[in-house]
């Protein structure tokens, strides 16, 4: 799992050109500057929108919130072509706080999440709703919807890995969830990362919180493992493919684990490329999430929900 998370994260995040920069109203965000993550032509107008309570959208506090949406096929590349989601087995619409990156010290963060009633857990497609990334390196904390629900995953260094469920599947939809984080960015053992959900402490880690110089926040929808989803939805057709084309020992093992919705990234791509001509057409359901009260500050009282 650790290797998979490193593979699915990319190293060239953040583009500071004027076209990429977005200005979020104080009603929904404070403390960080955000820009579109990947600024190629793929970034759709519906990718992120500032929406209003008056128009029937859910809002945690105030009059506005941020709505993110990813539809089937919403992959693209950055302006210089250095990174491509389409080639990398992923889709996204995210905002990046790379221009407000932090090098050290203690910070407080907050955001509130709302998953609509029609929301679906699409595992083994991995949907990331928020993360802390490093410049030119891997993420350190990711907030991913795993099979059992919304979870925090720690990936610091080559061997460190941990995951903790924050919100159960049966408690996610149709309500706001308030996330509060207290973090100290450090390469040493004096670092820490604490997560409260709806005023309850759910995660309390002490130790190094980074390996690179700078850490920054990202919000939105980031889907990884498109081929895993396609393979799972065509699992019977993989059997037909293997009967005709044969199978390696690794492919046979991967198929067995896929029945349990588990499969490693590289072998998933390999099986997809080998067997896709046997597949039925599959459209990934649209992913929608609302963010509100996205705040960063050195002081706890400056983040969270302000009624």
Regions found by a protein language model. Give the residues of each.
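Long, low-complexity, intrinsically disordered N-terminal extensions of eukaryotic proteins, enriched
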Residues: 2-3, 18-20
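Sec-dependent N-terminal signal peptides
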Residues: 3-14
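Low-complexity, Ser/Thr/Pro/Gly-rich disordered linker/stalk regions
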Residues: 19-178, 183-307
